[in-house]
Design a protein with these regions (language model features):
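Extreme N-terminal basic, low-complexity initiation segments
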Residues: 1-13, 20
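Active-site loop/lid in soluble adenylation, ligation, and acyl-transfer enzymes
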Residues: 63-124, 128, 132, 140, ...
């Protein structure tokens, strides 16, 4: 499978730059303020990322902590920002002692590849094709294998307090808790959905959701995907056969193993809200934590290309 014609129009991207907003723009930032000066350019080896230097300081007036879960419905422009923001929520909860947790829902507007913290780039990703097509490859802070992200794939992340849910310190219980919660929320519209493998949700034996986690001292980040209407051809185009496979996969190809929920986005979105009891919107978020993570980790070649 070669060439560009298999993909939706407009997916190809050769060079990418982005700049963060000034601190005075948009909603309040969560936990810090930012002072900007000259812009700097960082070369990840794949694409150029333009970032402003900043100095961060605590601003207690915008901290929000409670025992109620908060909803963050936010998609950023750059793939690095979106992957970093999940970790920023985890760090903010850990720093500020939040016990209610967060639910974040977002959807990519362009194609990129995400690899797990312990993934081997060469073994899991066709780097030549990604480079030719201008598709970024980003390493996340949680485990699991490589995935392709794009329009039609709804991402979610939950940050949960381990003080409120001490049993989630055990990884198997964390998987069971979050996946059973997700499945319960989706079952009214997808009766056949079930947990498969360690961290998948499947319908009639085909994967519709992959998930991974990361633990800190007092909080858990659990995040994953829900495919509802994503073209599946890019999976085989950009990914190699994974070195680790769940038993239920039975050596099937990406195309035969993965499927979509075939539901409208709004239906899947509402099912996610229902699963987590319709949390209230967060009025401020840890934007400068995210910016710092992008600058120091997610936009760097040393992080993405590290050898596990």
């Amino acid at each position: 499978m070669v060439g560009i014609g298999i993909f939706p129009e407009g997916f190809k991207r050769r060079k990418r730059t982005f700049t963060f907003r000034r601190a005075t723009e948009g909603p309040p930032r969560f936990g810090c303020t930012v002072e900007q000066s000259d812009r700097q350019t960082y070369d990840r080896g794949q694409s150029e990322v333009v970032l402003p230097p900043f100095r961060a300081s605590l601003d207690r007036s915008v901290l929000i902590t409670s025992r109620e879960m908060k909803l963050v419905d936010k998609t950023f422009t750059a793939a690095e920002e979106n992957i970093a923001f999940d970790e920023a929520l985890l760090l903010a909860a850990e720093r500020d002692g939040d016990e209610g947790g967060f639910l974040r829902i977002w959807e990519p507007t362009d194609w990129f590849v995400v690899i797990g913290r312990g993934s081997s780039l060469e073994n899991e990703v066709d780097l030549e094709r990604c480079s030719e097509d201008g598709v970024p490859v980003i390493r996340r802070s949680s485990g699991g294998a490589a995935i392709v992200a794009g329009p039609g794939c709804l991402f979610y992340a939950v940050v949960l307090s381990l003080k409120q849910y001490p049993a989630l310190r055990f990884i198997d219980r964390a998987h069971a808790h979050v996946l059973s919660t997700l499945a319960a929320g989706l079952r009214s519209v997808v009766p056949q959905i079930e947990r498969q493998g360690t961290s998948d949700l499947a319908v009639e034996g085909r994967k519709v959701s992959g998930n991974s986690l990361r633990c800190r001292k007092d909080h858990l980040l659990y995040h994953g995907t829900l495919l509802y209407d994503m073209p599946l051809e890019p999976l085989a185009h950009y990914l190699r056969s994974p070195p680790r496979q769940p038993e239920y996969r039975n050596q099937r190809s990406h195309r035969d193993f993965v499927t979509n929920l075939k539901l409208p986005r709004k239906v899947v979105y509402q099912a996610l809200l229902s699963a987590w009891d319709h949390p209230e919107h967060l009025r401020a978020w840890p934007q400068c934590d995210m910016e710092n993570l992008v600058r120091e980790k997610y936009a760097t070649h040393s992080w993405t290309a590290q050898i596990p």
